[in-house]
UniProtKB/Swiss-Prot annotation:
Member of the two-component regulatory system SpaK/SpaR involved in the regulation of the biosynthesis of lantibiotic subtilin. SpaR may function as a regulatory protein. The gene is spaR. InterPro entries: CheY-like_superfamily, OmpR/PhoB-type_DNA-bd, Sig_transdc_resp-reg_C-effctor, Sig_transdc_resp-reg_receiver, WalR-like, WH-like_DNA-bd_sf. One of its GO terms (molecular function) is phosphorelay response regulator activity. It comes from Bacillus subtilis. The keyword Zinc does not apply. The lineage of its organism: Bacteria, Bacillati, Bacillota, Bacilli, Bacillales. PROSITE patterns: OMPR_PHOB, RESPONSE_REGULATORY. Keywords: Activator, Cytoplasm, DNA-binding, Phosphoprotein, Transcription, Transcription regulation, Two-component regulatory system. The modification 4-aspartylphosphate is found at D51. It comes from the Bacteria. This is Transcriptional regulatory protein SpaR.
């Protein structure tokens, strides 16, 4: 059983989500407004479902605000299907998105897939790779004692490439590792994530991710 928070201004949607996920034995808390809520209301959950179009705050902006406080998967609920909007949401720290209207089986499958992946990632260890210190338990990366301020998906990309140092992966392979076979994001999101990772690494005079033209990316 997982503890899940669903945030949406439409109460009918919240009740539907609650009923669907309770069938999977999950505890589901609901929130139909965000304004005036203390930051800790978003903490302590295994997964958060976050509507994009809310009257008091844009869901992307809310994700950006709470991401430093929570380490669980954040899935957007959205009617937006434009590439720019999707990429924006994932770059702010979201892990995936579910398009409205959604089916009962789709919501259940996506939520449970992310929960399974999250449980697999909860292992206790650390490792130095190419001068970068990876803390796999806390999902943090350090270089020269400086912490890289990575989003959750940026960290996943770094860990995946670093643990397979020297091996080249296509954008599609990286996408599958981050989002799984049932991912609903866009391949161009991976390109944007890597661009941002490189920028953050270069602030510390490091450039571990190399482009293999026509093939993909590798960690050196």
């Amino acid at each position: 059983m997982a503890k899940i928070l669903a945030v949406d201004d439409e109460k009918d949607i919240l009740v539907l989500i609650q009923n669907i996920l309770r069938r999977d034995q999950h505890q589901v808390d609901i929130l139909d407004h965000v304004h005036g809520q203390p930051p800790d209301v978003f903490q302590g959950y295994d997964l958060i479902l976050l509507d994009v179009m809310m009257p008091d705050i844009d869901g992307f902006e809310l994700c950006k605000q709470i991401r430093p406080l929570v380490d669980c998967p954040i899935l957007f609920l959205t009617a937006k299907t434009e590439e720019e909007a999707i990429v924006k949401g994932l770059i702010t720290g979201g892990d995936d998105y579910i398009t409205k209207p959604f089916g009962v089986r789709e919501l259940s499958a996506r939520v449970n897939a992310h929960l399974r992946r999250e449980r697999r990632d909860k292992h206790q260890s650390k490792r130095v790779i190419s001068g970068f210190l990876f803390h796999f338990d806390s999902k943090e990366v350090f270089i020269n004692n400086n912490k890289l301020n990575l989003t959750k998906n940026e960290y996943k990309i770094c860990e995946f490439l670093a643990q397979h140092k020297g091996r080249t992966f296509s954008r599609e392979q990286i996408y599958e590792e981050i989002y799984g076979l049932e991912g609903n994001a866009l391949y161009s999101t991976i390109t944007e994530f890597i661009r941002t990772i490189r920028k953050k690494c270069k602030e510390h005079n490091a450039d571990p991710i190399k482009t293999v033209w026509g093939v993909g990316y590798k960690w050196e």
